[in-house]
Amino acid sequence: MIYPATRGLWLRLFLPFAAGYFLSYLYRTANAVIGPVLAHELSLGDNALGLLTSTYFLAFGAAQLPLGMLLDRFGPRRVEAALLVIAASGAAVFALSDALGGLALGRALIGLGVSACLMASFKAFAQWFPPERQASLTGWIMAAGGLGALAAAKPLELALGFASWRTIALGLAAATLAVAAIIWFVAPDKESEEKGTGIFAQLAGVKAIYSSRHFWRYAPMGFWFTGGFMAVQGLWASRWMAVLEGMDGAAIALRLTWMSGAMLAGFLFMGFFATALVHRGIKLEKIYLGAMLVAVGLLSLICTLPNFAGGLLWPLLGICFSLSNVSYSLVAQAFPPALSGRANTALNLLVFAGAFGLQWGIGGLVGALQAAGWTSDAAFRAAFVTLLGGQLLALGWMFLSRRRG
């Protein structure tokens, strides 16, 4: 396969998809800052807030399997542009809602609408760039998401001082429509290898992925680590800081900004150096496993000593989270380019099942323990220790499957 690599292609391909993923990540993490405002204005408890926030992940995850087939059949440009229109409508519904049901519907439409932003980028990169550049490209596109996470922290908190959350949501709806138009009219297209392939043939490809031992080596890690980090970053980190560290909204927003900045640094590291590391014979899987081991250590310290160096531990956890996304490249490299969309969305399904289940589950466990008489501090610690236990089990499975080959 010939891979053109002109500067014009880079600008026309990367920048539109990067803008989409920027918005996707901003939407994903915005509730960490907006959540307390919603809880106060609409009298939402932790359980309701967790459900509201996790509807994004539920809709996002449910879209992944059909999304993989759509990407492989119709291409990333058409699929992402169309879905972003749905995301814009969801932001508008969210902005105009006064009850939990309407807010949840809006978040679900947003989740469905941005469900292709990362996977469409991966598919486009697989079509236009050679395999040895995929890890670096993953780093660059994740850096765009890191910028979105940064925007959803202190800048969003400052914006709430000048405009209501409803006005901000309507502004995001307009920005999302603009990005959809840019992708539709600017991003290049390439004839899909799967065009004309029947639904049963496409499903056979999905079956091959889910039957692969290589895929299941990484699937539990995606659920507990990448999904778990999303659940924590998107909502429960801010609640932990408020309940166990006694931080106010401004301090939490600043901490989240540092955490997002650390994530961005990790993404940029992969963007700059991943291809060079591969050329030097350094296995990305070793970097991935090392980062996840460090993440377990950091979360253990946070759970055990919540008031010890949180300003350092949380940003370091952000760096580890950024490196967890290497798993997408590690999974996809075992499958041909024609299956790249389905391979990445198969893993992403597990990731977002984890994000939804764990985000809602943490809220449900905290609420149940508090109802049973536990203090808020003890309930949150128990929920985070449960997450830590799942991550340790996933690591154990990973090492066991590596030994078996």
Briefly describe each language-model feature range.
Residues 31-32, 213-270, 358-363:
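Extracytoplasmic gate region of multi-pass secondary transporters
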Residues 43, 75, 96-102, 113, ...:
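Helix-breaking motifs and short loop linkers at transmembrane-helix boundaries and internal kinks
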Residues 86, 90, 101-109, 309-316:
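Paired small-residue
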